[in-house]
Amino acid sequence: MGKEIEKKFIVSGDAYKSLAKGVLYRQGYIFFDKDKSVRVRVFNDKGYLTVKGTSTGISRLEYEYEIPVGEANEILEYLCEKPVIEKLRYKFQFEGFTWEVDEFLGENEGLVIAEIELPDENAVFKKPDWIGREVTGDPRYLNSNLVKNPYKNFKE
């Protein structure tokens, strides 16, 4: 059984760009509701199918499988809700933890989110200076919700 434990934060500034090279990710959702999602993702010429369950606090079940990239691209094109999410991901280590910063493109341009995966829900970690407010529990910032409610329509 896979379990994902993560926190999400708004990013201010672009200092993260000096820490890693951005990799283009394209992902789409075959199915999603408030409790679960099935997505396809393509990056680095590889395809992935991911199933995620209901969030409980900052954790949820997650299962991910590599699939042929050609099939992943076809699923993105023909079976996923539109628009497909496109983003540049910057992945790096900071104070012993892996951070991922997603700089969204297209309908969600202007949104930059940082995520940290944790070993358990009580893990203590240090944040880089450019990390802003936490949005872990805010459903607007779920990638699946950004398909139907893009960042350009947010009223902060």
UniProtKB/Swiss-Prot annotation:
<keyword id="KW-0378">Hydrolase</keyword>
<keyword id="KW-0547">Nucleotide-binding</keyword>
<dbReference type="Pfam" id="PF01928">
    <property type="entry name" value="CYTH"/>
</dbReference>
<comment type="function">
    <text>Involved in the hydrolysis of the beta-gamma-phosphoanhydride linkage of triphosphate-containing substrates (inorganic or nucleoside-linked). Catalyzes vigorously the hydrolysis of inorganic triphosphate (PPPi), however it can also catalyze the hydrolysis of ATP to ADP and phosphate. It can use ribonucleotides such as GTP, CTP, or UTP and deoxynucleotides such as dATP, dGTP, dCTP, and dTTP.</text>
</comment>
<feature type="domain" description="CYTH">
    <location>
        <begin position="2"/>
        <end position="148"/>
    </location>
</feature>
<dbReference type="InterPro" id="IPR033469">
    <property type="entry name" value="CYTH-like_dom_sf"/>
</dbReference>
<dbReference type="GO" id="GO:0005524">
    <property type="term" value="F:ATP binding"/>
</dbReference>
<keyword id="KW-0067">ATP-binding</keyword>
<dbReference type="GO" id="GO:0050355">
    <property type="term" value="F:inorganic triphosphate phosphatase activity"/>
</dbReference>
<dbReference type="InterPro" id="IPR012042">
    <property type="entry name" value="NeuTTM/CthTTM-like"/>
</dbReference>
<dbReference type="GO" id="GO:0016887">
    <property type="term" value="F:ATP hydrolysis activity"/>
</dbReference>
<feature type="active site" description="Proton acceptor">
    <location>
        <position position="29"/>
    </location>
</feature>
<comment type="subunit">
    <text>Homodimer.</text>
</comment>
<protein>
    <recommendedName>
        <fullName>Inorganic triphosphatase</fullName>
        <ecNumber>3.6.1.25</ecNumber>
    </recommendedName>
</protein>
<dbReference type="InterPro" id="IPR023577">
    <property type="entry name" value="CYTH_domain"/>
</dbReference>
